[in-house]
Regions:
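Intrinsically disordered, low-complexity regulatory regions
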Residues: 1-90
Length: 90
């Protein structure tokens, strides 16, 4: 693997990590620690639903202006890994 590819991987991983932290602060950690007012689904299941929605938008070409579905999917996958580490596969 080239040094450029290694650098790109590190740069993008850092950018996605910073985006996830910022959004998680803005949303009050709702992905990993939901308040469960209406939905009683586990954090893992809720994140999977959000991933389904993002992938559906990509497939159908119906993204919202300003959204970056690929970055959001990568972010949800990070949150999914965290939720599975904390709660298992519930």
């Amino acid at each position: 693997m080239s040094k450029q590819t290694q650098d790109d991987i590190r740069r993008i991983a850092k950018e996605i990590g910073e985006m996830v932290v910022a959004k998680n602060i803005a949303y009050g950690d709702s992905a990993v620690d939901p308040v469960r007012i209406f939905s009683k689904a586990s954090p893992v299941e809720q994140i999977l639903v959000r991933l389904d929605d993002k992938i559906s938008r990509l497939q159908r070409g119906t993204s919202y202006p300003g959204d970056n579905e690929i970055d959001d999917i990568m972010g949800y996958l990070i949150l999914l890994k965290i939720a599975k580490e904390r709660y298992g596969d519930e």
